[in-house]
Regions:
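Basic, flexible linker segments flanking DNA-binding modules
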Residues: 4-89, 161, 169-176, 249-259
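Mobile-element integrase/transposase regions
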Residues: 42-113, 119, 132-135, 139, ...
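C-terminal domain-tail junction helix/linker
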Residues: 68, 75, 80, 179-181, ...
Length: 271
């Protein structure tokens, strides 16, 4: 049952029982569920996590179907060729449309994520402009790194106008140059290549915005920001993460761990 579930993690208990019966193995759907329950595999999510972890530990090779499943399940899995070795080496940024607030208008979230630790930051704005992209870095992200005697080395963004433009005129490009930060962009017409931050957006929707949207009538962006700050504090310091390389650690614990891994030559070069 466990071997089959590794091969076909999305199949339900009845389908598993039927497929095993064709192989001469008699087990009921309830028996399949019992095995899954004993191994914490009752949900499809848990079975896909097991597949990803088993592959990461290099104990199995994935077939084409398994690769497609994991890429659909985990945006981060699509970034498996991107190796990040320490805190600040690669920081992903994006703009996310949250919704419209009565009396205020459209609300956008500027999201920032350290790709090594998955530590996240977010600020809400009523516009989608280069100045807001600069503001979240200058007022929130860079001071956090500086407080930990660290820095951002490379920014990864899509090709949105709030991030990209003529290097000698665009406010965001100029700010990154001033701070000595390299700017990389995702492939054109393929924003999903920034899978690190896509996973964050999905989590924010499922665990915060949709829940708050059903229970609270917000009257201002500031009110929304207060609740978002509270959630992000929980996300970074209390919520165990099961993504690639995280192994149940919190982003903040990984952030601190990654500080010790910054190569001396990198620190020296920057200095």
């Amino acid at each position: 049952i466990l071997d089959y579930s590794l091969t076909r993690p999305t199949h339900g208990p009845l389908r598993v029982a039927q497929e095993l019966a064709l192989q001469g193995i008699n087990v009921s759907a309830g028996g399949v569920r019992g095995v899954w329950q004993r191994h914490d595999l009752l949900s499809k999510h848990d079975r896909l996590l097991r597949l990803e972890k088993t592959h990461r530990e290099q104990t199995i090779e994935l077939n084409d179907e398994q690769i497609r499943l994991l890429e659909r399940f985990s945006p981060e899995f699509r970034e498996r060729q991107i190796e990040v070795h320490y805190t600040g080496e690669l920081v992903a940024v994006d703009t996310f449309f949250v919704g419209a607030l009565k009396g205020v208008g459209k609300v956008y979230l500027q999201t920032v994520l350290d790709c090594y630790s998955r530590h996240a930051w977010g600020r809400l704005y009523t516009s989608k402009l280069p100045v807001t992209s600069v503001h979240v870095l200058n007022e929130t992200v860079l001071p956090f790194f500086e407080a930990h005697e660290a820095r951002v080395y490379t920014i990864l963004s899509d090709n949105g106008r709030e991030f990209c433009g003529r290097p000698d005129h665009h406010p965001y490009e100029l700010f990154l140059q001033l701070e000595g930060i390299e700017h990389r962009t995702t492939k054109v017409r393929r924003p999903q290549s920034n899978g690190f931050i896509e996973r964050l957006h999905r989590t924010l929707l499922d665990e915060h915005f949709r829940i708050k949207g059903r229970t609270i009538w917000y009257e201002s962006v500031e009110q929304m920001q207060t609740d978002l700050d509270s959630y992000l504090d929980h996300y970074n310091t209390q919520r165990p993460h099961q993504g690639r390389m995280m192994e149940g650690q919190t982003p903040y614990s990984m952030f601190k761990k990654g500080l010790k891994l910054i190569p001396k030559e990198v620190r020296t070069k920057v200095a």
